[in-house]
């Protein structure tokens, strides 16, 4: 992978709806199906901005969703989503707050407004690294995103904030 070789990506992800109800990739969703043949469904994604191939991401799985929004300095509403395995759903609030603070800080400090319509985080227990900063679709090991007030230490909350901010920037 060479960061000086940039491409725009348009991707259609097709999978069995029952096993993989969530189909994600970089960019903005541009089309989707109800049902495809043989119990399959599909979603098409388009990332209109050139990026190196190593920042391409694709996720298919049975994941739960925490959803919120962020209003940019120009008034655009960005859809924020965190996808996790069902048992981890109640531990994502701090990660969502950390993401919103990171977006605001980037705007206030550098005047940089997020340029897609959606920003997603996926956190799964079996991701083999800490995190990956795929544009618009950050992928994390759950240990970097999950923190709950009654079980996590201050250090765990700080780590979530630091990792979410680092991958967003």
Question: What is each PLM-predicted segment?
Answer:
Residues 1-165:
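Hydrophobic helix-coil surface modules that form long, contiguous segments used
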Residues 169:
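Short active-site segment of divalent metal-dependent hydrolases/proteases
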């Amino acid at each position: 992978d060479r960061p000086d070789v940039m491409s725009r990506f348009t991707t259609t992800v097709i999978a069995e709806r029952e096993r993989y109800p969530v189909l994600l990739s970089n960019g903005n969703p541009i089309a989707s199906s109800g049902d495809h043949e043989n119990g399959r469904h599909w979603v098409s994604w388009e990332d209109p901005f050139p990026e190196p191939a190593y920042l391409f991401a694709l996720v298919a799985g049975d994941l739960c969703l925490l959803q919120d929004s962020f209003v940019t300095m120009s008034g655009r509403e960005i859809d924020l989503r965190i996808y996790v395995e069902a048992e981890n759903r109640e531990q994502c609030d701090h990660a969502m707050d950390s993401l919103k603070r990171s977006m605001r800080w980037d705007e206030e400090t550098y005047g940089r407004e997020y340029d897609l319509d959606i920003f997603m985080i996926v956190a799964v227990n079996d991701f083999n690294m800490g995190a990956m900063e795929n544009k618009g679709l950050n992928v994390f090991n759950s240990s970097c995103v999950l923190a709950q007030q009654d079980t996590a230490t201050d250090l765990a909350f700080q780590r979530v904030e630091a990792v979410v901010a680092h991958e967003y920037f």
